[in-house]
Amino acid sequence: MGVPYVPVIGLVGTDLLKRRDDMVLAPDPFGEGKVTVVAKAMRPDVAVFHVQKADRQGNVSFGYAVEAVILAEASEHVVVTAEEIVDRITEKDAVGAFLPSILVDDVVHAPFGAHPGGLTDRYAPDAEAMKEYVAASRDDASFAAYLDTYVFGVSGHDEYVERYVRKARQPEPVA
């Protein structure tokens, strides 16, 4: 969005400002003497999203909240992985939020790209795989072992899907 800061609701009077150097109190330009908290705007280098559908030009249909579009607008680069690549998506065709191709740097076809999480209207989370992920996240050594197996231990996305999104563990479609 290109703004240097954004107002943040609900933080006036909290001690969070004592611990954060990226938030300050500022005069509310519309509040007649009131103050508001403003936070330095984020400018991520890259935002990566996994979506239900995208087209070859980079137009994207998000099946979830518009906040993802705001993050894409704030980012220097946007990479989208998609369950399905179609010939053309227009804003009228989009289910949920729409991200225009002008904001997208690359689109990658990646079925089950949200695994072990779920994807709205496509598949539910893989409960067993999520339990394993949560357990591995408890300490650095366990998480390093998890990454060695599931990220660095496969040659790419196709091998990951073949090995770990097995028919027996494949999540059921969400109605």
Q: Could you describe each region identified by the protein language model?
A:
Residues 1-175:
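Conserved alpha/beta enzyme-core scaffold
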